[in-house]
Curated annotation (Swiss-Prot):
SUPFAM superfamilies recorded: Ribonuclease H-like
Cofactor(s) recorded in Swiss-Prot or TrEMBL: Mn(2+); Mg(2+)
Superkingdom of this protein's organism: Bacteria
Organism expressing this protein natively: Shewanella baltica (strain OS195)
Cofactor note: Manganese or magnesium. Binds 1 divalent metal ion per monomer in the absence of substrate. May bind a second metal ion after substrate binding.
Protein's recorded name: Ribonuclease HII
Length: 210
């Protein structure tokens, strides 16, 4: 597995292969909820304009692109790791596990997997075949399939935080999405934590030890 930093290298790599799955994650930093990943194989005959790192897009634009990706992609799959798995494995290894689940869930086996960042786990397709993978630093802004994966993962997790907000409105999940903000710290100090919290994360662990 190699790590690429430049768009030129990534483009040459991409153009030399067949079907490519882009993989990205969201939710490594929050104190609550799953870490969510997505794997997307785009259809080269159905281009999608405006793909970019999900963090650089407005919520409205992400939602529109989410629907377009779901409609036009050859296939996509969401993988996740639970708070319990995060606590057991640590957030890095749980994220790698979630990425593996996303790729294994694709109903088409890609020839190559491109992962955002500087790390990539070992991937196996749904048919048991091993897959070649490379990591692309800032790939979510460079490679269309990774951008698409970042959008699928981001919208999926944000929607889950909205559901959690409806169940626990006193925590403000719809606003901070579970990230460690001042308002979130104040909420857990007042109301405590529940089973969706990552108990190995320092702020949560400190509260439980009081």
């Amino acid at each position: 597995m190699a790590t690429y930093k430049s768009l030129t290298e990534a483009d040459l790599l991409a153009f030399s292969t067949g079907l490519i799955a882009g993989v990205d994650e969201v939710g490594r930093g929050p104190l609550v909820g799953d870490v969510v990943t997505a794997a997307v194989i785009l259809d080269p005959n159905k281009p999608i304009s405006g793909l970019n790192d999900s963090k650089k897009l407005s919520e409205k634009r992400r939602e529109a692109l989410f629907d377009e990706i779901c409609d036009k992609a050859l296939c996509y799959h969401v993988g996740r790791a639970s708070p319990a798995e995060i606590d057991e494995l640590n957030i890095l290894h749980a994220t790698m596990l979630a990425m593996q689940r996303a790729v294994a869930g694709l109903n088409i086996a890609p020839e190559l997997v491109l992962v955002d960042g500087n790390r990539s786990p070992i991937f196996v397709a749904h048919n048991g075949a091993g897959l070649t993978s490379h990591s692309i630093i800032k790939g979510d802004g460079l490679i269309a399939s990774i951008s698409a994966a970042s959008i699928i993962a981001k919208v999926t997790r944000d929607r889950e935080m909205d559901v959690l907000d409806a169940a626990y409105p006193q925590y403000g999940f719809a606003k901070h999405k579970g990230y460690p903000t001042k308002a979130h710290f104040e909420a857990i100090a007042e109301h405590g934590v529940f089973d969706q919290y990552r108990k190995s994360f320092k702020p949560v662990k400190a509260l439980l030890e009081l």
